[in-house]
Amino acid sequence: MHLHSPPLMADGSFSLSGHLLRSPGGNPSRLHSIEAILGFAKEDSVLGSFQSEVSPRNAKEVDKRSSRHCLHKMTEEIHPQQEHLEDGQTGGYGDPYSAKTSSECLSPGLSTSNSDNKLSDDEQQPKKKHRRNRTTFTTYQLHELERAFEKSHYPDVYSREELAMKVNLPEVRVQVWFQNRRAKWRRQEKLEVTSMKLQDSPMLSFNRSPQPSAMSALSSSLPLDSWLTPPLSNSTALQSLPGFVTTPTSLPGSYTPPPFINPASMGHALQPLGAMGPPPPYQCGANFVDKYPLEEIDPRNNSIASLRMKAKEHIQSFGKPWQTI
């Protein structure tokens, strides 16, 4: 088929005129459409043979026509794609060249690069986290927050909103502050509990000697005054009395208890002491001081010796009413 009329050249179905593509033998060569030149049809081998024969001027005309054809294809593809998306169907539009999009028509390699960039952006978006700036509280704000924390460790939302308006802070910041303050308070409570357990450990309670059952019954049955309670309630002082001597080392070896003092008589002697009141300070006689020198005992250095000395004074106070009778 030979092309001799100019109107056929204006049509976009043919790319080159007959006189440009005639072979040297006079026979007309194959004519190619714009689709074949742009690569829509797989005729690359035939297209390569004619690229060398096309002049630069004709190449510019071909580029202009191809760009017009691409724009025309873009406008035709927009409306069918919208209708196709509304119907929810997939596939082609009945046109063998409809698989080519406008982006592929303009630049075939641009669509793949754009899709790769979109995928990389989607992968990077979850990794980005919004970092909140650290809130710096003023002295007034901390004072008001501490006062509110003393009133209630768990304020409700209305109290938090009122406090937030008072200290000019967002309610979320006030809530976070109370959470951190409660955590700090729990840590302090745990430290206090552990310190109390260390104080009450058995290593520190070995000095506490249990009281004998007989002495506890005696002290509970006797109506003693407050000034007699400390020495009698102490087991060390009670063991130093003559009626409760269990070891020979509790009193000096030269001391012998008087014959009128025994456990039975001591109970009768202690009964009228509740009505007598506190006795006057007892003055030891000269013979007693000479027999038991007190200079050898230092109450400030030895607590046991001081308790023994108090026990001796009570023993002498018990024996004095019997001697007068």
Curated annotation (Swiss-Prot):
Biased amino acid composition, Basic and acidic residues: 75-87
Region (Disordered): 75-136
Highest taxon listed in the record's lineage: Eukaryota
Protein's GO biological process: positive regulation of transcription by RNA polymerase II; regulation of transcription by RNA polymerase II
UniProt name for this protein: Retinal homeobox protein Rx-B
Pfam annotation, one family: OAR
Motif (OAR): 302-315
Cellular compartments per GO CC: nucleus
Organism: Xenopus laevis
DNA-binding region: 130-189
Tissues where this protein is expressed: Highly expressed in anterior neural plate followed by neural retina, pigmented epithelium, in pineal gland, diencephalon floor and epiphysis. At later stages, the neuroretina remains the primary site of expression. No expression in the developing lens and cornea.
